[in-house]
Amino acid sequence: MNKKVILMILDGWGKSPDPKVSAIDNANIPFINSLYKNYPSAQLRTDGLNVGLPEGQMGNSEVGHMNLGAGRIVYQDLAKINLAVQNKTLSQEKALKEAFQYAKENNKPIHFLGLLSDGGVHSHTSHLRGLLDAAQNFGLKKTFIHAFTDGRDVDPKSAIATIENLNKYIHNTPAKLASVIGRYYAMDRDKRWERIKLAYDLLVNGKGKPSQDAVLSISNSYQNNITDEFIEPIIMTDDNNNPIATIQEDDVVIFFNFRTDRGRELTEALSQQDFHEQNMHKLNLYYVTLTNYDETYKNVKVIYNKDNITQTLGEVLEKAGKKQIRIAETEKYPHVTFFFSGGREQPFLGESRILKNSPKVATYDLQPEMSAYELTEALIPEIEKTEADFICLNFANGDMVGHTGIMSAAIKACQAVNKCVEKVITAALAHNYTTIVIADHGNCETMINPDGTPNTAHTTNPVPIILVDKELKTIHDGVLGDIAPTILDLMGIKKPEVMTRNSLL
């Protein structure tokens, strides 16, 4: 075969066992529904060991796109770090040992900051517990936790239980909770520096609502309809109303998020550069991150560096002299480029990139179509030119609107995607492209929890794969790692040996 291929990723578009709670099943999406009737389809697993995550763990976009491009199961930091915590080998990691040594010799406090969540998407509470144990065993007396509440990868009101568990865990240890803030502020990834500033001012200047009881403060927030993701800065204080701890020059900071994208902006403000407009000045810190947030950072120590993934689909296409396009809106642009290329930033030879800005709205339920129409308009002329041999396209709507937990908005998102899919596939068929329609993980097919509350998290449901081709009549079930071998099979290119997964044709 020598086909041109479009990989169309409907982000967050899973297969629900219960149509009642599914935005997809409740949406009017005649074109996507017709694809199942007219073309071969099967399903893919995107969770747990199928994508190199711990068993039972829901997939996410970063992991999903990495497996898609790699053509193999990529064992994720989460699985690696979990093992280190279980086997109590975390304290043997060089970067961590050296940070503890520095704190001890210079009598400096250690500030652990990160997402306090069992979601396992950006972080995991077990990793924080492992780090706290390691610090205590090292004999460190001044350890502080700056917790970012989740409510997005887990339920919107789960922070109270998570903080209660943390308080029990650190009772009778030297560790103390120093501050609390929602991830909406501390973990922005869209250059909304005014959000990061709230987190910076809390951590560095102790600016926040004073509290001696974080659980009480959070339940007050709930009464004002502010859920975990949006918790406003809370500074924990002692009996004299002084902050328990703020981050000072020469302190040790350990950022325990293992996923890289949402740790970058706060790290930049604390350690890399001054933001004069926001009055944020970098501090001279002993700064450690659990994984490598950015190769270009100066003076940031990394506990777990990434294994380089080579011979990804992009690289194989480059070697075969093929032209490829990666296209997405801002929210998923790193996924179709950096993650799909196995953690490589620069484009391959013959790779062009099309980025459309995601709309500047507070939350995407306010504009559920996001930038899907703009992406479609930009892509159609490229399909008509037929110069590209491979196109990787991501529609973000199912995931990003799914995260809001608002069913009516998610239905609108699905309907917008349906219109765009119709335009792209119509053009693809007219110009002899084969389109593989898949998702990277589930989300908008489960908008409501069994107890009736909104579900904002990803799911472990399987996702569809539809093979839109004029001749081929079968496609098999598989995992995300099978997609690159399938694409190479369609294009008539031999897959490299390191691509250990299989074509689904």
UniProtKB/Swiss-Prot annotation:
Binds 2 manganese ions per subunit. Keywords: Glycolysis, Isomerase, Manganese, Metal-binding. Its cofactor is Mn(2+). The keyword Membrane does not apply. CDD domains: iPGM (cd16010). The active site is at S61 (phosphoserine intermediate). The keyword Ion transport does not apply. It comes from the Bacteria. It is an enzyme of class 5 (isomerase). It holds the Pfam family Metalloenzyme. Substrate binds at H122, R152, D153, R183, R189, R259, T260, D261, R262, K332. Its EC number is 5.4.2.12. Mn(2+) 1 binds at D399, H403, H458. GO terms for cellular component: cytosol. It catalyses: (2R)-2-phosphoglycerate = (2R)-3-phosphoglycerate. Mn(2+) 2 binds at D11, S61, D440, H441. Pathway: Carbohydrate degradation; glycolysis; pyruvate from D-glyceraldehyde 3-phosphate: step 3/5. One of its GO terms (molecular function) is manganese ion binding. Monomer. Catalyzes the interconversion of 2-phosphoglycerate and 3-phosphoglycerate. Belongs to the BPG-independent phosphoglycerate mutase family. This is 2,3-bisphosphoglycerate-independent phosphoglycerate mutase.
